């Protein structure tokens, strides 16, 4: 029997939910969004996670469980509450200059939550794997450009094409080159301690 109460995929997604809830309760995002309903939906998702954590289901029964379906449905609802597709760009572009950096950080954490929830079913479909790395999404991308980090000689900043969108990532791999295929982990470094160590092990999205 698989112990779902210790499944990293479920634990990481629920932790991201808690962090997201704290952000949308306190952050001053500027834009046309339904803050009240987003908070309510994130709170209501807790019972789904609790039920899923102690379901001890396996295989298709776990992947296709009502709890997983409800979590994903609520995740999609939160995206709508935030403003739909492009909500992250709206919040960042509307942020005052003095709050831009903090807004980008908060948006990154909320996006991690959204990715964790909407991708939960696919990760659970991989089966009972007892490894923390399974709790995050990893996608393959192509490096489009590489530049040195302005504040750290041991880091590189890369523009990576994921197909549907391009992102900026930071890595300590000094041998990366344009045209390389790389694996990119989708998680905010603050969710893992110590963040510096984790960033040295994984490609980390920064925008």
Please give the residue ranges for each predicted region.
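Phosphate-backbone binding interfaces of nucleic-acid-interacting proteins
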Residues: 1-207
